Amino acid sequence: MFRRVAIIGLGLIGGSFAAALRRQGLAGTVVAGARSARTLEQGLALGLIDEGSQDLALAVRGADLVFVSTPVSAMETVLTKLAPGLSDRALVTDGGSVKTAVIDQARRALGAHFARFVPGHPIAGKEKSGGEAADAELYRRHRVILTPTADTDPEAARRGRALWTAIGAEVLSMAPEHHDQVLAETSHLPHLLAFSLVDTLARQGDSTEIFRYAAGGFRDFTRIAGSDPVMWHDIFRENRGAVLDALGLFRDGIDRFQRAIED
């Protein structure tokens, strides 16, 4: 489907994307762009990529597909660096968990090429991070939400949908603002609560004793607190409005339960 694919960011999401493309025979040459030479060396050793470059414009040169998988807060800087190397017909998409902020950043960074940008969010992941955790089956039977705008080229949107379908994902379309609201309530808020509970208990003087006797329910609820804190810091910050709204609704619910218990 794609002669040359450039993947910017080779962590779990980017690495799994590379592995899935290879598994399905959807890419001729896979190139990675990353800040760290060690990350690129690891990608080569794992067989995820064929080439790597720390120069992002060079990494995307000649690519007909570019997948950006970096922290949301770094997206504009990354897109600005790679933009000079984009070919006119290159399809650009991303794996960011927040869409409104990413779209605003892409509009500023990509200029005329913004029409070829198809914003996406694969609803898949693990507690483990890094390219060594890459899984070719990560996206199979999982939802991928695409949030094209009125400025998105229809042919680019069609190719983006076909790409994720070929990988094995269930593809949905949604308005960016609605995506951010829904994900704040179903994903961002649960992570925030898990982080908060673990942090609250860890600050107690007898925290070792508390965690020693934590049963299965506690482990199930707090499992996601082991997720990458840097990534989640970015998500909370970039989707702060929707997250704060969701947190307010949850606080109202907690207040109702507190009053019911007191009564």
What are these regions (language model features)?
Residues 4, 29, 116, 143, ...:
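Residues at the starts of beta-strands that form the adenosine-phosphate
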Residues 136-223:
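Internal alpha-helical scaffold of NAD(P)-dependent oxidoreductase catalytic cores
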Residues 1-63:
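NAD(P)+-binding Rossmann beta1-loop-alpha1 motif at the extreme N-terminus of oxidoreductases
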Residues 56-91:
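Rossmann-like NAD(P)-binding element
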